[in-house]
């Protein structure tokens, strides 16, 4: 979503190959237990350490939580934007009757040709490599954790759905956005089930673990931070699904390419909506918004599924991310490109009349993307071929990181 960034946390943007990074501390890993037992308060022995491991805790450490960091008077900004949101935000939603549904892309169970359609789907899926399925499954699991994302939006002061059926424009947007996003996980889940290439039970466990763990975006109930985060993430998912579409086509599965491309188009439309909110905030409060943008980038944007766990692998998100990086589905360069795009979209270079802190934030943001790209280029030049590891999602078949 004072915070201390853990340099080992998997959400850092310029990822290095897993073979060259130390493992991320985990609630389940020996390293975390070692760190915990070195604390004076926990020096009595392993039983005391073990007793602190509560059920349903995330698989890795989360940051110190900061709450309600937006000054209360700024809530009025979002109340004043109600009419603006109705006219400029809700237009990016599609009428349900005109929207695509998962069944539009899948074999029809009511038709006489259902079994033949499933056989054709499975034949096409046989041509897709295991590493592609690892990335597709990871993307699907990310989409299926939608309850967490709606919860996150409803933590934001001034825009949350206060009743569950609030008539405010902000609440209508959140519910309708969630309803549109819900189709993404449904469609990918059903496709993967029919493909016969994956271990659905392990995938379902991963989804349950992930929703139970939540997410740690470090947005502090602050809609400035929250909408900057969602602007970044919607563009990231647009890129990721667009790349899985392209690769499905390269492997000969035109139907899967259509599925991923359709989801990518939704993400692009949602990105447009969220970036418009932040653009309006820059118009109303340029100083506060540029400092919020810099704050999120200093903390580094964490991916929504960074607390992913399958019951076995504490470093599952790192491993999934490494495969996505190697295949070119979502990379450190993409992270820098998104930042560069948003800096241009919101015209950060052209902001004037800022405070001293605002000017510092502006300078930081304008220089950050080139710096990330330089770091990534050096990392790629030093990168070694990653090891092969088993993924439970594909029946423990091994895939190179």
UniProtKB/Swiss-Prot annotation:
Q: What is the effect of changing residue 219 to F?
A: Sufficient to trigger a significant accumulation of omega-7 fatty acids
Cofactor binding notes: Binds 2 Fe(2+) ions per subunit.
Q: Pfam families, per this entry?
A: FA_desaturase_2
Where on this chain does Fe cation 2 bind? 181, 234, 267, 270
Localisation per UniProt entry? Plastid, Chloroplast stroma
| Catalytic reaction annotation | octadecanoyl-[ACP] + 2 reduced [2Fe-2S]-[ferredoxin] + O2 + 2 H(+) = (9Z)-octadecenoyl-[ACP] + 2 oxidized [2Fe-2S]-[ferredoxin] + 2 H2O
**Induction field:** Positively regulated by LEC1. Up-regulated by jasmomic acid (JA).
Its subunit composition reads: Homodimer.
Function, as annotated, reads: Converts stearoyl-ACP to oleoyl-ACP by introduction of a cis double bond between carbons 9 and 10 of the acyl chain. Required for the activation of certain jasmonic acid (JA)-mediated responses and the repression of the salicylic acid (SA) signaling pathway.
Record's keyword annotation contains Phosphoprotein: no
- Entry-linked InterPro entries: FADS-2_CS (IPR005803), Fatty_acid_desaturase-2 (IPR005067), Ferritin-like_SF (IPR009078), RNR-like (IPR012348)
Question: Could you tell me the Gene Ontology terms of the biological process aspect for this record?
Answer: defense response; fatty acid biosynthetic process
Effect of knocking it out?
Increased level of stearate (18:0) and reduced level of oleic acid (18:1) in leaves. Spontaneous cell death, constitutive PR genes expression, accumulation of high levels of salicylic acid (SA), enhanced resistance to Pseudomonas syringae, Peronospora parasitica and Cucumber mosaic virus, and enhanced susceptibility to Botrytis cinerea.
Q: What class of enzyme is it?
A: oxidoreductase
Q: Which cofactor does it need?
A: Fe(2+)
Per the UniProt entry, the Enzyme Commission number(s) are: 1.14.19.2
| This protein's GO CC annotations | chloroplast stroma
This chain's source organism reads Arabidopsis thaliana (Mouse-ear cress)
Record-given protein name: Stearoyl-[acyl-carrier-protein] 9-desaturase 7, chloroplastic
Modification sites for N-acetylalanine: 36
């Amino acid at each position: 979503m004072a915070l201390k960034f853990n340099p080992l946390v998997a959400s850092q943007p310029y990822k290095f190959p897993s073979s060259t990074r130390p493992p991320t501390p985990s609630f389940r890993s020996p390293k975390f237990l070692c760190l915990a037992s070195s604390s004076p308060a926990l020096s009595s022995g392993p039983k005391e350490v073990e007793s602190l491991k509560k059920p349903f805790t995330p698989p890795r450490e989360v940051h110190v939580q900061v709450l309600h960091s937006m000054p209360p008077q700024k809530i009025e900004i979002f109340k004043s934007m109600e009419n603006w949101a109705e006219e400029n935000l809700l237009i990016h939603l599609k009428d349900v009757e005109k929207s695509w549904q998962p069944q539009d892309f899948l074999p029809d169970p009511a038709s006489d040709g259902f079994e033949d359609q499933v056989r054709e789907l499975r034949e096409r899926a046989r041509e897709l490599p295991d590493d592609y399925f690892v990335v597709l499954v990871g993307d699907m699991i990310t989409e299926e954790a939608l309850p967490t994302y709606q919860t996150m939006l409803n933590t934001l002061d001034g825009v949350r759905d206060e009743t569950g059926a609030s008539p405010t424009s902000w609440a209508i947007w959140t519910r309708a956005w969630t309803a549109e996003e819900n189709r993404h996980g449904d469609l990918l889940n059903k496709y993967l089930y029919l493909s016969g290439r994956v271990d659905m039970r392990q995938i379902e466990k991963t989804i349950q673990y992930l929703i139970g763990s939540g997410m740690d975006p470090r947005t502090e109930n602050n809609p400035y931070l929250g909408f900057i985060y969602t602007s970044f993430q919607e563009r990231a998912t647009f890129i990721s699904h667009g790349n899985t579409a392209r690769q499905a086509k390269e492997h000969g599965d035109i139907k899967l390419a259509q599925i991923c491309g359709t989801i990518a188009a939704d993400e692009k439309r949602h990105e447009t909506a969220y970036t418009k909110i932040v653009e309006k905030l820059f118009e109303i409060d340029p100083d506060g918004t540029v400092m919020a943008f810099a704050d999120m980038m200093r903390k580094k944007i964490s991916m929504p599924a960074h607390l992913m766990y399958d019951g076995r692998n504490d470093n599952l998100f790192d491993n999934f991310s490494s495969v996505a990086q190697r295949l070119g589905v979502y990379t450190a360069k993409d992270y820098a490109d998104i930042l560069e795009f948003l800096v241009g979209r919101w015209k950060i270079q052209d902001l004037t009349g800022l405070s001293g802190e605002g000017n510092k934030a502006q300078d930081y943001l304008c220089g950050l993307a080139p710096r990330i790209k330089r770091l990534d280029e050096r990392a790629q030049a030093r990168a070694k071929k990653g090891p092969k590891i088993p993924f439970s999602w594909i029946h423990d078949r091994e895939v190179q990181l």
